[in-house]
Amino acid sequence: MRRAAVVAAVGALVAGFAVYGSAQAQEDPARDASGATAASLREAAAASGTFVGTAINDGLLSNPTYANIAASEFSSVTAENAMKWDTTEPSRGNFNFSGGDRLVDFANRNLHQVYGHTLVWHSQLPGWVQNGGFNAEQLNQVMVDHIDAVAGHFSGELAYWDVVNEVFNDDGSMRQSVFQTTIGTEYIANAFRAADAADPWANLCINDYNVEGINAKSDALYDLVSSLLDQGVPIDCVGLQSHLILGQVPGDLQENMQRFADLGLEVIITELDIRMDLPADSGKLAQQAEDYAEVVTACMNVPACEGITVWGISDRDSWVPGVFPGQGAACVWDESYQPKPAYDGMLTAFGG
């Protein structure tokens, strides 16, 4: 990939952090409680040639336990909300980068790479865009201007950008977002070209959920990505969100990742969590550990799978219970920031 040098440089920083991380080990409550003191997730992933990341709520970085786990256990951080459109450009031409800047500063201090999320998405879109009444030419310019400002602001600071997010319905049809209905499918290529112009250093990704296995939706994604590549659109990677259900890791996950890799693309597990019916018990937690390990193993078996990001650190702060009533316990750390069996499952699968 033409941006490989940037990622390689980040990898060198991550490897260098291993010494620092080892020195912290006895002060890291997550590692002490897990009983797995040979390595952190960060060290184990680096040794395997991959990154391991987490979504970060920049407002929680003032919590020292949260910040310490983020710093010591992960090599990549994704902005949970701080880089989304409703935050970065709540009104036209008025930009707010404070949350994203805090995340980049935290990443720089802890030798993390930064994964930008997301430039164009149908959700968390401010009303002035959603209901602006723009025609196709106008909305395309609004989108390009937004990408130019946001990706341009962080240019050279990020390893990856989710350029477009969740463009498909589950049946493989195009989601009827304001961009799709107004501009047409070409908005996707336009967004990638704009992102490439604004930040030629970041790897540019398309990201979606329920595309982990081979199904109508992932087939549609595969066809779209193939078409973009045929058009010479600067796309570098495919993000598989991987918001999974206990015991339901797709059996063809590895095969699915490999077919995207065979197109010459990187593949990233971008938003991994594995939810269960509450309350959690020892049996469910053991199954969850197996599931997390299965995802890591699938990634490790596909050389183009560059890394795995979990969607949040602790069950305390997870999005899952608010969206799926009666379900939760989806993260690797529990509500008290203690590591669950899933931690050791991931660590072992990484080779730690």
Sequence positions of predicted segments:
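Boundary/entry segment of secreted carbohydrate-active catalytic domains
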Residues: R31-E80
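Secretory targeting and sorting signals
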Residues: M1-Q26
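Active-site clefts of carbohydrate-active enzymes
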Residues: T118, N203-V211, S242-H243, F260-Y292, ...
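Acidic-and-aromatic substrate-binding clefts and catalytic sites of carbohydrate-active enzymes
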Residues: A55-A67, W85-S98, F168-S173, V211-A220, ...
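Aromatic-lined carbohydrate-recognition surfaces of secreted/lumenal glycan-active proteins
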Residues: V52-N57, D162-V163, A189-S218, I268-E271, ...
